[in-house]
Amino acid sequence: MKEKNTFGILIVLSSSLCFAIVPSSAKISLDFGSSLFILLFSRCLIGLVLLLPFLFFQKESVYIKKNYVLPVVFSSIVSVSLIAAVYHAIEYINIALGMTIVYAFPIGIALITSIRGEEKYSLREWLSILTVIFGLFILVYDEMFTGSLYGIVICIISLILMTTFVYTSSKLADSLGSIVLNFHLNLWSLIFLFISYVLFSFTLKIPDNSIGLTSLFFNGLFYILSYTLFFWGSRFIGVTRTSVLSLTDPIFATVIAMIFLNQFLSIIESLGFIVVLVSIYFFERSKITKKP
């Protein structure tokens, strides 16, 4: 049990490390001329292509039972809508504020699993979750207060979509497996994006140099790695613990920025950094000590 628990934690932390690269690679690709539609479409297409060899070598069937089709389609639509909503929101508000709102999704996951009787949480665990969110708030405090009410509303919608996507998809991953689930999520997302293009004629523009194209590829690569590892890890340690541990995403992003971009933290940001790490530690310690 202890080995399984440790393995699950390592998988989720690996997922967070991968996801920390996604926003930067997306921004570089967009800065070098990629349209948003191409970014989203290539992300799903790259994920689909990369998962095929794993399905082949593991001899996994891509076919799923009829009773799973509608839930998978629903999760795919929610996934694409989530990404579109987040990118739309940050056109109106600071990205730090937007991501802080969206990263509150573990509270939603904890509420759902608690109400449905799937998990029970102690007061210390609730306080740990809330303190993690507060730590993220401190971490991005200096950059937060710019934007509009409209952007905040869109971010709240994104938060609801994120909570819905993570909860429904984690349940599907328990039944279908992470690789099969992510294959279908990307497949149906591509279909949904294609239909959207036919209806609305979105701009198609690829990056205009090798740096942009490379960033486009890495965006798709680390996106599919992060979600595949996320749902794989949730099968070992549960969706709530996975969600809370995924809040290390901005921590990894901060460390990457410090190493490669020489962007160091202020005193307030450092305090937020420490609060997040300590809160996650106490949440995990509480979960582990509760296990028989």
At which residue positions do the language-model features occur?
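Loop-to-transmembrane-helix transition segments
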Residues: 7-15, 42, 61-85, 150-158, ...
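Specific transmembrane alpha-helical segments of multi-pass solute transporters/efflux pumps
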Residues: 18, 23, 52-96, 102, ...
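Glycine-/small-residue-enriched transmembrane alpha-helix faces in small-molecule transporters
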Residues: 1-38, 42, 77, 85, ...
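Transmembrane alpha-helical segments that form core, pore/gating elements
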Residues: 12, 25-27, 51, 109-110, ...
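C-terminal transmembrane-helix exit sites in multi-pass transporters
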Residues: 50, 55, 86, 105-127, ...
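Helix-helix packing/entry segments at the starts of transmembrane helices
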Residues: 98-104, 169-191, 223-259
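C-terminal-most transmembrane helix of multi-pass membrane proteins
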Residues: 44, 141, 212, 247-292
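Hydrophobic transmembrane alpha-helices of multi-pass small-molecule transport proteins
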Residues: 51, 121-141, 193, 268-287
